Amino acid sequence: MKKKIFYSIIILITGIIVGRNIYLSKTTQTFSNKDIYYFIQEGVYSSKSIMEENVKNMDLKVVDEIDNKYYVYLGITKDENIAKKLKEIYESLGYQIYIKELSLSNEEFNNNVTQFDLLINASTSTKEILTIEKVVLANYEEIIKKNI
């Protein structure tokens, strides 16, 4: 009888330990420290010369080269509603825009974008919004791209 109780306690403790380890490994993978950003994408180009020709008149842009493709971004935000607002602004200017979700993990950039999103929400004019996005893109260049 004592052996059965002893083995039952050992099995119970082993089950708790194994279950806890599995739970922690699953929650760690699910809840990473990366934040979701909405990138306002103008296009993807396979040729640098074609990309340069198409965006030469845009003063407000960031270009990321990934696997010999050139991604042109006109804005970055953490707020989906602001992303939709930016898309509307750029489409009214004649651009074909895509909203692309990307994950980044940089606390400084996260804090900056959060503050800029608050400014955009308080802004009423397109000019103000585009000026704020110019600063966001400069932040991306300075904080994220320099560390890649």
Give the ranges of each region predicted by the language model.
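Acidic/polar low-complexity segments and flexible, solvent-exposed patches
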Residues: M1-I148
